């Protein structure tokens, strides 16, 4: 509590490094990072504090605690649970300094954003604003929005596309094979443009 991402990030980084060290068959230069909801936030946050991951995927993650506060299904009550009664006006360290958006310039890991357009838990703007920041910074990033889906991707065909998108992104950045990604998104604008798509 009252650490937002710091404490959890230290645990994940330490565990990942230890696992790689203890398993010689693991290529430590090709580790992927993925998370959804709070895990999506953690995925974004981790990329601001470490470079151990070769690619990352955030599904429905919070990028800015200050903008998320008061929004969505949870709204201000989120701080009652995860922030231990801290608020934007009482704890800048939690709400600003540990929000990925305010540290976007520190991210160099290729980062994919996935989000349902009808998410009532974490508004889709949380992914859009972080994606926009990384595009402005010239980072490797992409965003795929799943039309008509909420916090969870439940429609069968769209879930298949969502899962294939995950596998294709990791194949591109962890295996050096962008064939699958191109097959799914060959019409996606190049990296100098928006690089986002709705499925």
Model-derived regions: residue spans:
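Active-site-proximal cap/loop segments of hydrolase catalytic domains
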Residues: 1-199
């Amino acid at each position: 509590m009252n650490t937002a991402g710091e404490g959890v990030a230290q645990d994940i980084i330490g565990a990942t490094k230890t696992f790689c060290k203890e398993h010689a068959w693991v290529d430590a230069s090709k580790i992927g990072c993925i998370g959804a909801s709070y895990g999506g936030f953690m995925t974004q946050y981790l990329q601001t504090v470490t470079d151990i991951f070769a690619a990352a995927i955030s599904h429905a993650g919070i990028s800015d605690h200050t903008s998320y506060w008061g929004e969505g299904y949870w709204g201000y009550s989120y701080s009652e649970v995860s922030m231990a009664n801290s608020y934007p006006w009482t704890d800048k360290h939690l709400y600003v300094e540990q929000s990925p958006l305010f540290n976007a310039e520190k991210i160099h890991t290729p980062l994919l954003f996935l989000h349902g357009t009808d998410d009532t838990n974490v508004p889709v703007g949380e992914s859009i604003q972080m994606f926009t920041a990384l595009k402005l910074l010239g980072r490797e990033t992409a965003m795929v929005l799943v039309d008509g889906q909420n916090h969870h991707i439940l429609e069968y065909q769209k879930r298949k596309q969502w899962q294939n998108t995950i596998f294709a992104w990791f194949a591109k950045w962890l295996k050096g094979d962008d064939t699958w990604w191109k097959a799914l998104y060959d019409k996606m604008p190049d990296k100098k443009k928006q690089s986002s798509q709705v499925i």
